[in-house]
């Protein structure tokens, strides 16, 4: 049995490494068409604080991490899903559920995670308490399909993983976010075993089985209440995935008022469900084409997938910094997806890139954090932000991979008053303005990296 499991894992690792990019692009959440501003003053205040942070981490971790495959989606029987040749759908699904008996992150070290991401300059975190597969990364009372009950880690004193993750990040000053999937494919009241499961939604008629749906709504409300009721401390963000089910269908409107008694100003992110419970938008693996004037976040992966995969192809630090500059200039935040390994740590290859990002932010972060949009926000590879007082502007030159810094930077509009400070090394340089065009000659000796400038208007 163990040999068979190992063979299956090796086979899957190779297959899904090749398929990861295809799967990633086959289904991503687009942003909602519109935005509804919340009316609660505490939520508005929390959103303003969150918009100061700019850079966060979104951690996917669960059963899918064991073989290193696309998170949850492989048990969804849709046309774009890739599984090993010859495997039956039901056989594969049972194999996947069986990973709950294998998942054993003996090196689980949330303090290491918090150190790594704080050093990377990240200011908020979102952790997957439950993905679509239904496997709970917290000690829920409402199902045994959880890390705290189903497998070998159930005997570990840190079996209530979400609690230990949240508790490790709070002392570092992070805003704390709980990811929760509204669909639960393991729950019999969502995918009932009496019927086949051909698609991601419920597999029965609610009109014919209203009691089943009521059971599911109660189950979901109970789990959300567990997470937000105080047992896991004060939360800042409730990040709800699975936009084919709306929050109000599963009782979110009843949960939030009680949750906000424990966590005043709790930001609700009912993804892609335009309305009062989507307090910020979340375009996935993309950046909006233009500036937006309401709260939003691009959630994007460091590698090719959300969870850990073997031999990942990571984005460079330079690329992440350039994307972060574009996002902040357009008014958003970046939640960067980094998945812990099956045994519970952040892998070294990811740490190297994150350290490089953090080193840049320690020198140039003034051009990112606590900024707001300005009317003229882009000129070629230059992205502009403004300080909150509107009197100081920042420009970040997004240096592409494989290219060297130019000797000078030029742009139109946003005319500096006085000298320009190069945040990378703190030196002041002259800005030459002629016919509405600004030219800044860069000082010698700069590292070959994105450049951040600061100047007054």
Walk through the language-model features, giving the residues of each.
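Mature catalytic domains of secreted/periplasmic carbohydrate-active enzymes
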Residues: 24-457
């Amino acid at each position: 049995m163990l040999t068979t499991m190992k063979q299956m894992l090796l086979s899957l690792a190779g297959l899904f490494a090749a398929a990861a990019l295809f799967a990633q692009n086959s289904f991503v959440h687009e942003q909602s068409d519109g935005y509804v501003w919340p009316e609660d003053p505490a939520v508005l205040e929390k959103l303003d604080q969150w918009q100061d942070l700019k850079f966060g981490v979104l951690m996917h971790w669960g059963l899918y991490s064991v073989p290193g495959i696309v998170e949850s989606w492989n048990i969804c029987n849709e046309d774009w899903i890739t599984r090993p040749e010859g495997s039956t759908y039901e056989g594969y699904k049972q194999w996947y559920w069986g990973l709950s008996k294998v998942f054993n992150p003996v090196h689980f070290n949330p303090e290491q995670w918090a150190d790594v991401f704080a050093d990377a300059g990240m200011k908020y975190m979102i952790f997957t308490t439950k993905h679509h597969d239904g496997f709970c990364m917290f000690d829920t009372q409402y199902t045994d399909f959880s890390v705290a009950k189903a497998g070998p880690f159930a005997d570990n004193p840190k079996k209530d993983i979400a609690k230990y993750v949240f508790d490790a990040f709070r002392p570092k000053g992070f805003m704390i976010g709980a990811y929760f999937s509204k669909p639960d494919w393991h729950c019999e009241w969502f995918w009932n075993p009496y019927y086949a499961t051909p698609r991601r939604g419920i597999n029965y008629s609610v009109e014919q089985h209203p009691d089943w749906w009521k059971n599911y709504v109660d189950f979901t409300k109970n789990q959300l209440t567990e997470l937000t009721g105080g047992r896991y401390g004060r939360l800042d963000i409730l990040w709800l995935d699975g936009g084919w089910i709306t929050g109000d269908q599963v009782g979110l409107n009843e949960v939030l008022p009680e949750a906000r008694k424990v966590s005043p100003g709790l930001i609700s992110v009912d993804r892609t469900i335009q309305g009062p419970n989507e307090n910020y938008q979340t375009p996935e693996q993309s950046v909006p084409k233009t500036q937006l004037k309401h709260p939003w976040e691009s959630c994007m992966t460091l590698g090719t997938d959300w969870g850990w995969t073997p031999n990942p192809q990571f984005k460079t630090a330079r690329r992440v910094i350039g994307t972060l500059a574009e996002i902040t200039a357009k008014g958003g935040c970046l939640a960067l997806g980094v998945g812990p390994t099956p045994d519970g740590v952040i892998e070294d290859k990811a740490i190297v890139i994150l350290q490089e990002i953090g080193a840049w932010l320690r020198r140039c972060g003034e051009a990112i954090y606590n900024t707001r949009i300005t009317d003229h926000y882009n000129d070629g590879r230059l992205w502009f932000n403004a300080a909150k007082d509107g009197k100081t502007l920042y420009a970040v030159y997004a240096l592409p991979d494989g290219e060297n810094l130019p000797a000078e930077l030029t742009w139109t509009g946003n005319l500096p008053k006085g000298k320009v400070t190069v945040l990378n090394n703190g030196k002041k340089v002259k800005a030459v303005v002629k016919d509405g065009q600004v030219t800044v000659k860069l000082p010698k000796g700069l590292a070959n990296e994105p450049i951040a400038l600061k100047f007054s208007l």
